[in-house]
């Protein structure tokens, strides 16, 4: 069964075993600049998908890429957010998710939009939607990735499950990232205080 979805950044359609993601043009940008930005982002996302496959990290397999379009394998399963909402043991799902995000960060992949809607639960948990992703070795970037996730969880789920998430996340390189996360949280609280003060 196929589907067609248009978001702010791309048009996504799926049929059979493949998903086609075509980046949307921005009418307010000069056409030549728009094409350069779109093609650059498409190449970056394709590069990350190749790296994920090479490392054995669960994510859609890249089939082909051209210009503004990526063709990838369709991942069968349920959006993780829905699975968590109906699960008798959501803590276990959050621990598995933490372990997967840890693998991304160990590989220096910053997802850029960590929410439970950007993971699919099938035979395992798969990370999807790498449209905002990039490569970085900086603890700061990994910490911001986690901070965005914390905010998303606070809006969609019970924040108590973050403890399970971090149980799964703990491992290689996590100590320095979590230390930096403390600084990022403090900065976020100061911004919020200024906004409401």
Swiss-Prot record:
UniProt family annotation: Belongs to the protein kinase superfamily. BUD32 family.
Catalytic activity from the UniProt record: L-seryl-[protein] + ATP = O-phospho-L-seryl-[protein] + ADP + H(+); L-threonyl-[protein] + ATP = O-phospho-L-threonyl-[protein] + ADP + H(+)
Cell location: Cytoplasm; Nucleus; Chromosome, Telomere
Protein name, UniProt field: EKC/KEOPS complex subunit BUD32
PANTHER family: EKC_KEOPS COMPLEX SUBUNIT TP53RK, NON-SPECIFIC SERINE/THREONINE PROTEIN KINASE
Residues that hold ATP according to the record: 4-12, 22
Alphabetical GO biological process terms: tRNA processing
All copies of domain Protein kinase, residue ranges: 1-197
UniProt entry keywords in alphabetical sequence: Activator, ATP-binding, Chromosome, Cytoplasm, Hydrolase, Kinase, Nucleotide-binding, Nucleus, Phosphoprotein, Serine/threonine-protein kinase, Telomere, Transcription, Transcription regulation, Transferase, tRNA processing
Domain comment in the entry: This protein is considered an atypical serine/threonine kinase, because it lacks the conventional structural elements necessary for the substrate recognition as well as a lysine residue that in all other serine/threonine kinases participates in the catalytic event. BUD32 has protein kinase activity in vitro, but in the context of the EKC/KEOPS complex, the catalytic subunit KAE1 switches the activity of BUD32 from kinase into ATPase.
GO cellular component, one term: nucleus
Coiled coil: none
The keyword Cytoplasm belongs to this UniProt entry's keyword annotation: yes
Organism: Encephalitozoon cuniculi (strain GB-M1)
């Amino acid at each position: 069964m196929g589907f067609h979805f248009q978001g702010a950044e791309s048009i996504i359609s799926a049929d059979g075993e493949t998903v086609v993601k075509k980046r949307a043009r921005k009418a307010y940008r000069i056409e030549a600049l728009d094409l350069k930005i779109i093609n650059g982002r498409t190449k970056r996302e394709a590069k990350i998908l190749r790296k994920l496959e090479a490392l054995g990290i669960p994510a859609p397999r890249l089939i082909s890429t051209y210009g503004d379009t990526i063709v990838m394998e369709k991942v069968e399963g349920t959006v993780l957010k829905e699975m968590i909402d109906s699960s008798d043991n959501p803590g276990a799902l959050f621990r598995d998710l933490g372990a997967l995000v840890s693998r991304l960060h160990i590989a220096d992949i910053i997802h850029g939009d960590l929410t439970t809607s950007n993971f699919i639960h099938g035979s395992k948990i798969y990370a999807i939607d790498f449209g905002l992703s990039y490569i970085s070795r900086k603890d700061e970037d990994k910490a911001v990735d986690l901070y965005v996730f914390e905010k998303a969880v606070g809006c969609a789920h019970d924040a108590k499950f973050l403890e399970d998430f971090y149980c799964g996340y703990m491992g290689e390189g996590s100590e320095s990232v979590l230390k930096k996360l403390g600084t990022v949280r403090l900065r976020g609280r100061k911004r919020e205080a200024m906004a409401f003060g």
